[in-house]
Each structure stands twice: as structure tokens, then as C-alpha cells.
């Protein structure tokens, strides 16, 4: 009989986050308990609590992992980026983000739904927005002032989140994917209007 492989810290956190994701998608964040999450892992209660003290900490890591996933996707398309066509490039990337059907999207949808009733989630949302803005600036370096002010950034964030919610809650993802070009054109139009 072979020795049981000991999981690394990253593997254990990933196992916990995968369990949490399943429960959050099924029950919603407000009804998710640490006990639910622990039950979906191969770890002991103490083992899970060693890495995460509460569901909020796990959700925060899930949201950060989702941002890292999205940044990798954008970086993989940087060869399409051309100076002078920044708005078009960003519109394409933002529309892809809005309609992407990935592991993190249903969790993000639950996060958006729950943040209205949970002030701690709203604080996490504001923190994630700051990190997103910094990442956009980092991706394009100083070639392009992505968002001239916070009001513009807030508007574009709200616009994207409305499409993300509709994609999931209203099952509109397929319709949006079919009309992707129109969504990109709308995003370019909105961006150019608000950047004046």
C-alpha cells in the first residue's frame, strides 16, 4: 500500500475553495456555513479552519482567483492590442468577461446578489474594484488612460455587472454570445461617450 500524498498549502486552499464554490452556487452565500464547506472536503474541521476562519475569507479568495483568471485571459490576448485601438481592445475583453461561462462566474453572480444585503460584501466589492482598476492600468501600462475618473469606472463596472447578472439570472448568455459584436459596439459607443 502506497503512502498518502500530503497536499500542499495551495492544493488544500484550492480544495476548500472548490467546496465553497459548490455550496455558494447551490445555497447562496448567506446560507453557506463553514460546516457545509468542510463536509465537501477531505480535510478535518481544524484543517479547514487553519486556512480560513470564516466564509467571507473564502469568498474573498475566490473573487481574487477570479480576477487572476480574468487577467490571464486578457494577457493571453495582448498580441491583439494595438496603440490607437485601446477602446476596441478593451471592449472586446470586457464583453468576453461579461459573457464568459467559467468556474468563477456563478460565484460572482451570487456575490453580486448578496452584496446588496451584506455590508461586508459591499466593502469587499469596493476593494475588488480598486484592484481591478490597478490591473487595467498595469495591463495597458501608461499607453491609455483607461478610466478618466472614478465615476466613469463605476458606470462601466455597473454596466458590465448588469450584463453578467442577465447572462446568468435571465439565462441570456447564449443570446449575448450570439450578439457579441453588437455588445462590443455598444461598449465602444458608451466608452467613447463617457471619455469625452
What residue ranges belong to the model's regions?
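Amphipathic alpha-helical packing segments from all-alpha helical-bundle domains
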Residues: 72-76, 100-109, 119-144, 154, ...
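Helix-loop "lid/cap" segments that line or gate small-molecule binding pockets
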Residues: 92-99, 107-117, 190
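Hydrophobic alpha-helical connector segments
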Residues: 61, 75-103, 153-160, 179-184
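N-terminal intrinsically disordered/low-complexity leader segments
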Residues: 1-11, 196
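Short, basic, alpha-helical segments at the C-terminal edge of helix-turn-helix-like DNA-binding modules
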Residues: 64-70
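Residues in soluble alpha-helical coiled-coils and helical-bundle/repeat scaffolds
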Residues: 53-57, 61, 82, 99, ...
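Helix-turn-helix
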Residues: 15, 19-57, 61
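Hydrophobic/aromatic-rich alpha-helical bundle segments in the mid-to-C-terminal region
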Residues: 122-126, 142-194
Amino acid at each position: 500500500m502506497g503512502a498518502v500524498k500530503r497536499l500542499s498549502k495551495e492544493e488544500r486552499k484550492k480544495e476548500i475553495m472548490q467546496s465553497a464554490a459548490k455550496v455558494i452556487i447551490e445555497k447562496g452565500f448567506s446560507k453557506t456555513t463553514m460546516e457545509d464547506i468542510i463536509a465537501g472536503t477531505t480535510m478535518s474541521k481544524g484543517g479547514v479552519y487553519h486556512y480560513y476562519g470564516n466564509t467571507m475569507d473564502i469568498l474573498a479568495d475566490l473573487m481574487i482567483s477570479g480576477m487572476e483568471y480574468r487577467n490571464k485571459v486578457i494577457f493571453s490576448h495582448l498580441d491583439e492590442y494595438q496603440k490607437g485601438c485601446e477602446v476596441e481592445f478593451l471592449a472586446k475583453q470586457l464583453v468576453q468577461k461579461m459573457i464568459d461561462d467559467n468556474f468563477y462566474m456563478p460565484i460572482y453572480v451570487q456575490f453580486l446578489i448578496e452584496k446588496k444585503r451584506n455590508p461586508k460584501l459591499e466593502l469587499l466589492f469596493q476593494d475588488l474594484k480598486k484592484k481591478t482598476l490597478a490591473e487595467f492600468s498595469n495591463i495597458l501600462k501608461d499607453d491609455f488612460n483607461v478610466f478618466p475618473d472614478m465615476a466613469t469606472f463605476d458606470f462601466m463596472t455597473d454596466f458590465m455587472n448588469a450584463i453578467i447578472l442577465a447572462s446568468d439570472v435571465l439565462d441570456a448568455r447564449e443570446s449575448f454570445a450570439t450578439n457579441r459584436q453588437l455588445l462590443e459596439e455598444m461598449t465602444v459607443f458608451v466608452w467613447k461617450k463617457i471619455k469625452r
